[in-house]
């Protein structure tokens, strides 16, 4: 008996069928053939097969099927080797596999991600956020929290937690929703797995919330389109600038779900649905001054929308779902309208053409197509149609003949803020503005004017007007803030 127990192994036998998986306890083939007749006869007297031994202190995994349970004892002649492979493995239903889930259910509800993917999602989530209170609290018991989150996802017990709502006032009052840190890890987990298959189908002219496609990419892309259609500013052309009305709070979740289902399925679709249809208004904490919420227009508040509409601004999942939704619009404009010169950044889009009549026809087509297919509409107050020679204002930059400059409103705000803000915040803010101004092709004069403001406040500027330094007095006595 001791010898048989030592040679037995717990082996998972994967059935070659699309119907079920069966786990059996079988011996190694090379050692099962060496069983003696006496041992087999002794086991028969105990009423069980000589090819199976019970493993002491070994419990199978959840869902495993042990073929030794509920088996009738039958007489085995001495010297005849028996095997648990007597149970037929095939497409024919068998009693021993009745508790195993079907392949369709297993494929749909099985969480097919690794723990390494969850760890990578955690690192992606904490990037630039490690000093936040929620990230620090999660990291205090990092291993335990990650293991608990992994178990919840694997067992289907995960539920989104409380969100935080606050209001920003620059450039205009807007609601911002921040999910709990552990929920943001799940957002990154979903994003890391499914985003590549969607990005592969996106057009090259869609920007925002796509790796390598920020505001600078959008400005350069539009500038290249203008140079192409005008033959390096030698021919006239017109542009049509469109904006979607109340975009994020008007998104129909059912439309997004139907677009997601075209490329993902199973457990990942279930997780995407759970994140998509979660209503943060059911459990949230309002931070900041409550009266600021009244400054947000009612039609732009998520709290004023029906349950099936609106995505919380601030979550990675919302930005990704918005790109999935508007990819349908991109495909319609590029292939339906056959618009060759087109660029979109979130809900702002620019169409270029030689004929203003063609652009008016395209505008009418888009106005009719959006409500029917996506449940969205255009903002008529932000629709612009004029020659490109007058300048195209897009993603904070103005593209004019042979130059690209920073929007005047942004530059004037930079001068005003750096001249009035506290000294302890000036160093970081000024360098941020220098980096923003450098994105334009013609920005030397603007950077020089910003540098003059900083020099008057005691800061040193490099000769190319690309960055500022703290003055020598700010280092005395370890005081980095007082100038």
Residue ranges of each PLM-predicted region?
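Right-hand nucleic-acid polymerase module
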Residues: 2-9, 15-18, 24-26, 31-34, ...
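Basic/polar, acidic-poor N-terminal "presequence/leader" segments
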Residues: 57, 66, 70, 74-127, ...
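Active-site-proximal segment of RNA-dependent polymerases
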Residues: 105-108, 191-252
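A structured, charge-rich N-terminal accessory region that forms the first stable segment of a protein
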Residues: 117-153
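Short, conserved non-catalytic motifs in the polymerase core
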Residues: 128-136, 161-188, 201-213, 279, ...
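Active-site-flanking structural segment that lines cofactor/substrate pockets
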Residues: 144-172
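Conserved polymerase palm-domain catalytic core
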Residues: 145, 225, 229-346, 351-365
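A common structural junction motif
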Residues: 264, 367-376
